[in-house]
Amino acid sequence: YSATIADVAYGHAKRDPELPVLNFTFVCDQDSGDIVFAHAYEGSIPDVTAFGEIVFRMKDAGFDFSKVILVTDRGYQSLINIQKQIDLEVKFIQGIRLSEDIVKRSFDRYDASLHNQRFYDTGERVYAHSTTEAWKQYTDYGSLNKTLHLHLYRFPKADEAEMEELRLQVQQVLDLKNANKQVPPEKWLTYKRFVCERTTAQGHRYWDRDDNAIEAALRYAGRFAIRTNAEANPFKALSIYRLRGQVEQDFNQFKNWVDGNRLRCTDTAYWGKLLVCTLATSLRMMAIKGAHDREQGNRKIPNNSIDCLFTILKQIQADKRQTANAWVTRTITKKQRDMLALLGLENPPRVLKN
């Protein structure tokens, strides 16, 4: 809502698209969720374009890439960004868009393997086949040959689920068009390529499904690909990639629980708000992780909500003595003691003195 922040710009906001936005990227610890690096930049810059600068800034800040693997989703994927990570000697696991011709050809070539039970893993519940790619690392002293792993995956029944959902959405569009009703703009933009207008022999015009377009869109349904220089085993690579759900939990905490989704402040104050919200998110994530690690028996986070836990702790009270400069803690219930233990905290002292 700010009219003074210079870096806000109109981007691709799904919520309140009439408002300009500021992009804010997190890099979080895979285990604890603690935010280890954050970068804010103009809202009109897409993730894939900003990725290179983010990695360079992490390098300049002294981030030690030798001890970590950078896991990113398809939103950051491009051949240029892959090359930057190779040149900077970053270990990475990168989700890949299926729009690359080399990826499509690989799926076509190894389609039989992706239907062979020998290539199936019951733990990850996925078929996988791996191939290698030859890349170059460009240094000040010339180029070096590098080998990357391209992992191809097929998720059983996912292609049928995608087909069913696509057919359902297309049918809804057809029903509206043939009833001369308006299709919601976003829905029409997404599905208009799957319908076409036809004419009967009597000259009657009607809307019909374009099966060729649907078949082309579903050709690689249920497929996924990863490119990496860090893990040769496709199932281990996918297991690591799936852990990036921690990032989504971070953003959920930032946007929905610490008031980080709206900047109701000026150009001189928004950096402070971003810092405070980032610290608050890290503290909440560390509390959630620590509490889950300490769960045992009946001692669990109530309703799996850290806010319910905090509410129970807020009920701990102390009364001031009338005859002394001290506070006396009221009796602490077993439930409150359990919540303190989940956070790794000791029970407060019986008497608190100024």
Task: Put a short name on every predicted segment.
Residues 1-354:
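Anion-binding and metal-coordination hotspots
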